[in-house]
């Protein structure tokens, strides 16, 4: 039996903790990555592990929550997560790659308690928000190489952050941040060019 098959059986038997342990083991065997304990690697299902691509020397801090759902209920866009070499996901970070892809370039740091969301629900009157389809016109997040996202920041669906950019702590990023610039605030705005 494969590791994914074993995880599915454990989930079916209600042994969720054991299934998470098996998935964590599979990720560690396939990728030289350091996960601090406790880290929630999965939340929606145990068949989407191939939607995660990890480079070498990726570090995921304690209490991080990494959610990848390839086929989300209210979206036709695939959820995927790609963390390139040397990426640091700090303590308490929440990555939600469902209904869109999240890509983080080599050497980037997502500081403590940041939230990165690949998709969000549409605003449609008269429908419970949780049941509205996801906005497929603005989804996915691209974070370039050597980017530093300050603690407590939120990166919204559709955001594109260029290489060597810095996001000040507590910012809300939407839209495009050019390479080599410092942005901050709610919503994040240009502060200066990094020289």
Set out the residue ranges of the language-model regions.
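Conserved catalytic-core motifs of eukaryotic protein kinase domains, centered on the activation segment
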Residues: 120-122, 127-128, 159, 193-194
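A generic "structured core" feature
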Residues: 148, 154-172
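Short, flexible, mixed-charge acidic loops at enzyme active sites
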Residues: 55, 84, 122-131
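A short acidic, glycine-rich active-site loop
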Residues: 130-141
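Residue-level signal for alpha-helical context at structural boundaries
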Residues: 126, 183-184
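Domain-scale signature associated with acetyltransferase and cell-envelope carbohydrate enzymes
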Residues: 1-118, 141-145, 153, 163, ...
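Conserved coupling/switch loop of ABC ATPases
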Residues: 97, 157, 175
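Alpha-helix boundary/capping detector
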Residues: 113, 119-121, 134, 169, ...
């Amino acid at each position: 039996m494969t590791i994914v098959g074993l995880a599915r059986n454990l989930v079916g038997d209600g042994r969720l903790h054991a299934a998470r342990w098996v998935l964590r083991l599979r990720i560690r065997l396939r990728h030289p990555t350091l996960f601090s304990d406790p880290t929630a690697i999965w939340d929606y299902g145990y068949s989407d592990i191939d939607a995660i691509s990890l480079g070498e020397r990726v570090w995921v801090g304690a209490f991080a929550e990494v959610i990848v759902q390839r086929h989300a209920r209210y979206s036709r866009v695939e959820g995927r997560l790609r963390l390139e070499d040397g990426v640091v996901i700090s303590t308490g970070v929440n990555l939600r790659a469902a209904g869109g892809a999240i890509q983080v370039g080599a050497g980037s740091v997502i500081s403590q308690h940041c939230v990165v969301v690949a998709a969000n629900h549409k605003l449609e009157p008269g429908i419970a928000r949780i049941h509205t389809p996801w906005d497929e016109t603005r989804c996915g997040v691209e974070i370039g190489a050597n980017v530093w996202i300050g603690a407590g920041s939120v990166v919204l669906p559709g955001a594109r952050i260029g290489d060597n950019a810095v996001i000040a702590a507590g910012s809300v990023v939407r839209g495009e941040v050019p390479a080599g610039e410092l942005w901050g605030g709610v919503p994040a705005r240009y502060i200066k060019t990094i020289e």
